[in-house]
Amino acid sequence: MVLQARSKHRDAAPRPPRPARSSPPPLNGASEVAARELGPERAPPSPGRRSTASRKGPRAETAAPAPDGLAGRLAAGLHWALGLRRGRGRTWSTLLLASFAALLHWSHITQLFENDRHFSHLSTLEREMAFRTEMGLYYSYFKTIVEAPSFLSGVWMIMNDRLTEYPLVINTLKRFNLYPEVILASWYRIYTKIMDLIGIQTKICWTVTRGEGLSPIESCEGLGDPACFYVAVIFMLNGLMMALFFIYGTYLSGSRLGGLVTVLCFFFNHGECTRVMWTPPLRESFSYPFLVLQMLLVTHILRTTQLYRGSLIALCISNVFFMLPWQFAQFVLLTQIASLFAVYVVGYIDTYKLQKIIYTHMISLVLCFVLMFGNSMLLTSYYASSLVIIWGMLAMKPQFLKMNVSELSLWVIQGCCWLFGTVTLKSLTSRIFGIADDAHIGNLLTSKFFSYKDFDTLLYTCAAEFDFMEKETPLRYTKTLLLPVVLAIVAAIGRKIINDMRGVIANQETDVRKHQVDHGELVYHALQLFAYTALGILIMRLKLFLTPHMCVMASLICSRQLFGWLFGKVHPGAVVFAVLAAMSIQGSANLQTQWNIVGEFSNLPQEELIEWIRHSTKPDAVFAGAMPTMASVKLSALRPVVNHPHYEDAGLRARTKIVYSMYSRKAPEDVKKELIKLKVNYYILEESWCIRRSKPGCSMPEIWDVEDPDNAGKTPLCNILVKDSKPHFTTVFQNSVYKVLEVIRQ
C-alpha cells in the first residue's frame, strides 16, 4: 500500500557520508547524510525549479571547513544555528543585535514597572503589598529563605511549612513550584555576603514623606534590598528572552530581517504578549523564557538531518527549566507533543527522530518528578499519558503498516488512537493514584463547551483572565497588521502542506516526495499556532502563548521557502520594511499608551490591617478570608492562614469553599462550626466581596446559589455580619474595606 512506500522512504538505509569536514558524531542509529547540513536557504531544488546557483546575483558562498577542537566545533555550530554562512563577522553581529534587543526589552519592562508603581520609593511593607494574590504567596517563600539564619535552614522552613495551610505541615517546594525563589534567595545571600566582604554598599535608604497626614516611611533602593533584587532578576531574565526571540526569528526565517520582524512585532503588541511588567512574581515570568529556548531547540532538531546528543540534552534541560517553575507547563508541552505527533503522522519527520524527542520529554518529566519530591500531578497528567501512548504507537508501527487502508484513513486512525488512549490512560492513572488535583481543569474546559457549573469552575470563569478571549483582541492584532501577516504565512504553509499531501496520497515517486516532505519545522509551527489559538480563545490568559508565537511566525515573511516567488520580483528588504512601517503606525501608538501609564502604589486600608495584625494579635493567631488578602497576611504579618491563592490542590479547594461560605446564604452557626474545625481565630471580612459582580451570575452569593440551591433567596451571611457580627463573632478591627471578626468559641 501507499503507507509501505512512504515507510520505505522514511526508514531507508542512509547514504554514506562525504568526508567534507569533521563534525561531532551523531547519535547511534541516526541517519548519516552529507556532512554539510542544509540550512533554510540551501535546500535541494524541487523538480522544475532552478537551483540556487542558477539564480541571478552573486553565488552563495560555501561554508569553510570547521576548525579542529572543541572551540572550533562550537563556533561552527553557532554559525549553523543562526542560519548564517558568511563567517564569524555575521555571527557576532547577529549576537550583538540580539544583545541590543535584550537590553531594550529589559529597559522597557523595568521602566513600565517603575512608572506604574513608583516601586523605588515604596517602603518594604508597600512593596510586599504590591505583590498581590499569588504573587505575594510566592515572594513570601523568597523572603523566608533570605531572612533565615542560613540558606539550608530557610529551605528546611519552606519544606516544613505550617503557616500556609494551618494546621497542616506541607512541603511548599513540592506543592508550589518554588525553585525560582530558592535559586534567587541563594543568589541574593551570596551577592550580599560578597558585597559586604569587599565593602561595597548594596542599597541606599532614605525617608520618604507621604503627606496627607501619613507617617513618613523608610525606602531603600538597590540590589541589596530583597524586593528590588527579586524583581531585577526577573526583568533581566525576560530581557534575555528577547535575545532568544531575535535568534529564533533569525533561525526560523533564515534572515536577520526575520529576527527584526519578531522583535518589533513583540514590541508593537507588547500588552498582548506579556504581563511581566505588571506581575513579575507570577510563574510564567520565570518559565516562559525557557519555553522560547525549548521551541528554538525543537525547531533546530526538526530542521537538521543529523541528530546530535547535545541537542537532545539541551532540549531536556530546557524542558526541566520550563516545567519546574510552573504547574501549567505540562499542558503547553501536551500541545507541543500533539503537534509533533501530527507532523510525524503525515510524514514530515521519521520514527527515529520522534522517538528521541519522546524519550527526551520522558526523561525531563521524570527529572521534574524527582525534583518536585514526587509530585503526582506530573505522572497523572495528560502530558505524561500522551508521551506513553505515542511511545507505544511508535513501537507498534509494524502493526499499523499491515493495515490494508488508505493513507488518509491511516492518519485518522492514528489520531483517534492517540486521543482515545491519552484520555483513557489519564483517567486510569488518576484513579489508581487517587489524584484529583487537576480535576478543576477538566471541569473548566467542560464549562466552556457545555452548561456545566460548580463552585470552583465559577471562581475561574468569573475572573476576566479565565473567560473567553475578548472580541477586541483580534481587532488589536489586525490594527498592528500582525494577524494579516500571520494569516498570509499560514496560507503559504497550508498551500505547501496541501501539495505535499496530494503527493503522498497519490503515491508519487519516492525521491520526488523526499523533497516535498522536507521542512517539517514549518508545519510544526503552524500546528502549534492552531493549538495556541484554541487555548487563547478558550482562556484569555493563555493568549500570552498565542501572541508571542504569532510574532515568531511573522518572521517567516522573510522566508525564501515560502515567498521566493515574490522575492524574485521585489527585494526582500523592501517588502519587510514596508510591512514594518505599516505595523509601526498602530504599534508606536500602543507603545506610547504603555509609556503614558504613570501611577504610584498605595493601599492604606490594607496597610492599616497589616499593622493592626502585627501589633494586636499573637504570632500564632490563625486567619481566614479572601485568597488575595491571605497571601498578604502571610507575607507581611507572618501569621498562619488556612487558605491561599494557589488553587491547584483538591484539599485547598475544599478549604477555600469552607472559608468562602461566609459569603453564602448559610446560617452563621453552621459557618462558625466549620471555621472552628479549621482552628480559625480571626476572619477578615470584605464587604466588597459580598456585592462585587464582574458579570451576571458572578457575585459570591450568586455563585453559592449554584452550589447551595437549598438556601437560595435568603439574605447573604456577609450582609448580616457587616451590620452586626454578634452573637457568633466579635468585631475587633474595622476600616473602610476590612472588618476583622474574632470567632467566639463556646
Curated annotation (Swiss-Prot):
Enzyme class: transferase
Subcellular location: Endoplasmic reticulum membrane
GO biological process, one term: protein C-linked glycosylation
Molecular-function GO term, any one: mannosyltransferase activity
The reaction(s) this protein catalyses: L-tryptophyl-[protein] + a di-trans,poly-cis-dolichyl beta-D-mannosyl phosphate = C-alpha-D-mannosyl-L-tryptophyl-[protein] + a di-trans,poly-cis-dolichyl phosphate + H(+)
Keywords (A to Z) from UniProt: Endoplasmic reticulum, Glycosyltransferase, Membrane, Phosphoprotein, Transferase, Transmembrane, Transmembrane helix
Positions of the UniProt region annotated as Disordered: 1-68
Biased composition (Pro residues): 14-27
Pathway per the UniProt entry: Protein modification; protein glycosylation
Family: Belongs to the dpy-19 family.
Function per UniProt: C-mannosyltransferase that mediates the C-mannosylation tryptophan residues on target proteins. The reaction occurs on the luminal side of the endoplasmic reticulum and involves the transfer of a mannose unit from a dolichylphosphate mannose (Dol-P-Man) donor to an acceptor protein containing a WxxW consensus sequence. C-mannosylates the first two tryptophans in the WxxWxxWxxC sequence motif in thrombospondin (TSP) type-1 repeats of UNC5A. Regulates neurite extension during development.
Protein name: Protein C-mannosyl-transferase DPY19L1
